[in-house]
Regions:
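Structural signal for conserved beta-strand scaffold positions within catalytic alpha/beta enzyme cores
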Residues: 79-81, 142, 160-162
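Charged, glycine-rich active-site and insertion segments that engage polyanionic ligands
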Residues: 1-49, 65-68, 136-138, 146-254, ...
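Catalytic acidic motif of RecA-like/P-loop NTPases
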Residues: 114-120, 125-132, 148
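Conserved catalytic/switch belt of AAA+ P-loop NTPases
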Residues: 100, 125-142
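Clamp-loader machinery-focused feature within the broader ASCE/P-loop NTPase space
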Residues: 2-122
Length: 334
């Protein structure tokens, strides 16, 4: 049990172990990296190690505190997310008040602040005051995908750790160690390198189902069948912007990998570099429907969509551009 069960970022694991071993834990830390680097998983594991009743430089996983954290009922670990597109000033004011309350059962009161880059000027300035006047028994772990969107004064008060995506070798070794066959472990390692969050969170069954649904969407879009059904589903999901963007990013990512394989099959039918090898027969059929020029165009369009997601474009615009990429016609009823 412990931090070492997480995939990748061994340098950061060593740093966290050192903090725990020397009992020299910063009161505010900033974990920077893509969601697929599993910053949330590392933050929870580090918080668990701090609160563990039987720790040396890691958590035991079996004490009462560890079990309560796993069940998400531990009173002195709180994970905070923005209410809407940005954090509201009222959220930060409540956090400031809670910051001064003593821990109920834990060694510290720990706040994990997800998407810290989503603080606007008002909420960021309010949070800065919290960091400037920390309570002795409180700790903050901020998570961000983009360091550049945080106030320099907030960054200067945090110990910053920069996370990277696990390497294909780390991912493959991890999954083979769990008894997964080499071919599937290799597939998962490719998906993890493409930024698929489920891989590093070890949600393999969920990922396989998402991949199957992505292939189904690609088939329907290529055949121009059930496009209205896909459009309706995307519009329904877009009612919750954050959840939609999470889903849409994964969909675009998985479609890009499927298109990459079709492109390779155009070049060489027996290519040994196919990622979705278990779908090869279906991808061969899609190759007949999607000429190389169309595949290259779609790969390019998916790259543009990734950029547009980062630019926080309106969800309706993202959906429109996505559908137009495959149908090559205007969709007026988005």
């Amino acid at each position: 049990m412990g931090l070492d069960q997480l995939i990748g970022n061994n340098r950061i694991k060593n740093i966290l172990h050192s903090y725990l071993r020397n009992d020299n834990i910063p009161y505010s830390m900033l974990f920077a990296g893509a969601a697929a680097a599993n910053t949330v998983g590392f933050a929870v594991a580090f918080a668990k190690a701090i609160q563990c009743l039987d720790r040396n430089d890691d958590f035991c996983g079996v004490c009462r505190h560890c079990e309560e954290i796993d069940k998400e009922i531990f009173p002195d670990l709180k994970i905070i997310s923005p209410e809407g597109q940005f954090y509201k000033k009222e959220q930060i004011i409540f956090l400031k008040e809670d910051n001064y309350r003593r821990p109920m059962t834990g060694k510290k009161k720990i706040f994990i602040v997800k998407d810290a880059q989503k603080m606007n000027e008002n909420s960021a300035n309010a949070f800065l005051k919290v960091l400037e006047e920390p309570a002795e028994s409180t700790m903050f772990i901020l998570l961000t995908k983009n360091l550049n969107n945080l106030l320099p004064t907030i960054k200067s008060r945090c110990q910053i750790l920069n996370f990277t995506l696990p390497t294909p070798e780390e991912l493959k070794t991890f999954f083979m160690g769990k008894g997964i066959e080499e071919s599937q472990a290799e597939l998962l390692s490719y998906l993890g390198q493409s930024g698929i969050e489920d891989v590093v969170e070890d949600n393999v069954d969920d990922l396989m189902e998402k991949r199957r649904r992505s292939l189904d969407i690609l088939i329907k879009l290529s055949n121009k069948t059930n496009v209205d059904e896909i459009l309706l589903d995307l519009n329904t999901r877009s009612r919750s912007r954050d959840k939609f963007l999470e889903y849409f990013t994964e969909l675009v990512n998985l479609l890009s990998l499927l298109l990459r394989d079709i492109m390779l099959l155009h070049i060489e039918e027996e290519s040994g570099y196919i990622i979705n090898i278990d779908y090869k027969e279906t991808l061969m059929n899609l190759r007949q429907q999607l000429p190389m020029a169309k595949v290259l165009y779609l790969v390019y369009r998916m790259e543009l969509l990734f950029r547009d997601i980062q630019r926080n474009l309106n969800t309706k615009v993202l959906i429109l551009e996505f559908i137009k990429s495959y149908t090559m016609k205007e969709v007026s009823h988005v």
